[in-house]
Amino acid sequence: GWVVLGVVFMALFMFWGAEQLERVFGGRELNREPKMRFIGAGALVGLALVVLAIGQPTVAQRWESIATEKEAALEAREVQLQAGEVLHIMHDHKLKLVLLDVRPEADYNLFHLADALHIPLDEINMLVSDLQLEPANTVFLLMSNDEAGATEAWKALTAQSVPNVYILEGGINEWLRLFACDDTRIQAIEGEVADDQLAFTFEAALGAAYHCAEPDPHQYELEYEERLKLELKRGPTGGGCG
């Protein structure tokens, strides 16, 4: 909105400047010019102000416009990558894997996957412009302790046209169930754990220093359904004027 308004005023200023030059150097009598040009200028400014008032669609509004299609993909488990596929992608040099951990900082400090970036869920939208500049072979993998937080982040990024965004199926808890069973320093919490809460205790906050942060793919034979489908690179979403 502000960009449109600025462009309109810049254009009007240039037209006004051109008229003044013609008046000074060309002897043009502006008082004899049609008054309709003022009406036209006013209409342009009015239109720009309307655009400014309407503003840019919010992330929630953008999501609503695609919710039917994307919710179906979530329900069909098309965007939740299983641990076996993620482990394969980690070692696929044709792809650039960007791991985005949206859990609380305390959980991230206890344990996180190797090279995972800590991005608080309420700050995920600030990252959109940077993510859209990544190469076309980039895969973005969101993770939370289960899937709730990662799903919210996925909706936000998908609504803003960030391509190739996926969710770690089962979250960090499922990852630890698969790869941390031989590490006595990591123990499963007995009983029920609240949704999207860490279901394990750790001897120390070692972050990615635990071996299960980057498992050796040759030590595991995990069956998985291939769900990764690279999208063609798309430009940043405008979401409206402004």
Task: Please provide the spans of the model-predicted regions.
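Flexible, polar/low-complexity N-terminal or interdomain linker segments that lie immediately upstream
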Residues: 2-98, 102-110, 188-242
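Short active-site oxyanion
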Residues: 93-99, 114-115, 138-140, 163-164
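A short, well-structured beta->alpha microelement
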Residues: 81-88, 102, 115-129
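Second-shell loop/turn segments in exported
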Residues: 70-74, 114-117, 139-145
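A contiguous, mid-protein "functional segment" used to position or interact
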Residues: 163-206
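Catalytic cysteine-centered active loop of the rhodanese-like fold, especially the PTP/DSP P-loop
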Residues: 1, 122-178
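Mid-length scaffold segments of soluble, non-membrane domains
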Residues: 107-120, 133-139
